[in-house]
Regions:
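Gly/Ser/Thr-rich active-site cleft segment
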Residues: 9-11, 122-180
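Short active-site oxyanion
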Residues: 73, 97-98, 152-157
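Glycine-rich phosphate-binding loop and adjoining helix at the ATP-binding site
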Residues: 55, 86-148
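Short, flexible active-site-adjacent loop segments at beta-strand->alpha-helix junctions, enriched
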Residues: 81, 90, 104-105, 164-166, ...
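N-terminal glycine/serine-rich phosphate-binding loop of ATP-dependent small-molecule kinases
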Residues: 1-96, 124
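A broad, structural surface signal
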Residues: 48, 52-59, 63, 111, ...
Length: 180
């Protein structure tokens, strides 16, 4: 018999659940992690905490279900969408905390884009509303405000993604840089 692990990497905790071939829960684990609020309206997570809680909760779920890792057929990840980060392409080290989906630090930049008259264009091209929730303005903030980020990105030394991308990259030992 094989098993599936479902990982829910959420905003305040990570939960992993092992299911059998009838989709019955056979093991689970959950861990909370620290949120960081460096300024008003800012919300960040340490990416290493996110990865550590995924690994720890998977181990707890396997132990809880008395399952061996080699019995796992697949792993699925659901995560806090639009939480974004950069990490070093070689070492895997994050260059800054992950900026959480709730973060509002790019509100003024979004307002400027609106006043410049590009909101409709952005929505037409992306299908998304102009809002700090989405990754693009966070990406710009990271490039503009994290020392060395822009030059490292231009040199091809950084990877960017949402939390699922970061987790997949680390769980595959840097083989896969992907998202859904």
């Amino acid at each position: 018999m094989g098993y599936i692990i479902a990982v829910d990497q959420g905003t305040t905790s990570t939960r992993s659940i092992v299911f059998d071939d009838q989709f019955a829960i056979v093991g689970q684990g959950q861990e909370e992690f620290e949120q960081h609020f460096p300024n008003s309206g800012w919300v960040e997570h340490n990416p290493k905490d996110l990865l550590a809680t995924v690994i720890a909760t998977c181990k707890k779920a396997l132990n809880d279900g008395k399952i061996r890792a080699k019995e796992i057929l697949a792993l699925g990840i659901t995560n806090q969408r639009e939480t974004t980060l950069f990490w070093d392409k070689v070492s895997g080290e994050p260059i800054y905390n992950a900026i959480v989906w709730q973060d509002r630090r790019t509100s003024k930049f979004c307002d400027k884009l609106r006043s410049d008259g590009v909101e409709e264009l952005i929505t037409r091209i992306t299908g998304l509303l102009l809002d700090p929730y989405f990754s693009a303005t966070k990406l710009k903030w990271l490039l503009d405000n994290v020392e060395g980020a822009r030059s490292k990105a231009e040199a091809g030394e950084l990877l960017f993604g949402t939390v699922d991308t970061y987790l997949i990259w680390h769980l595959t030992n840097g083989v896969m840089h992907a998202t859904d």
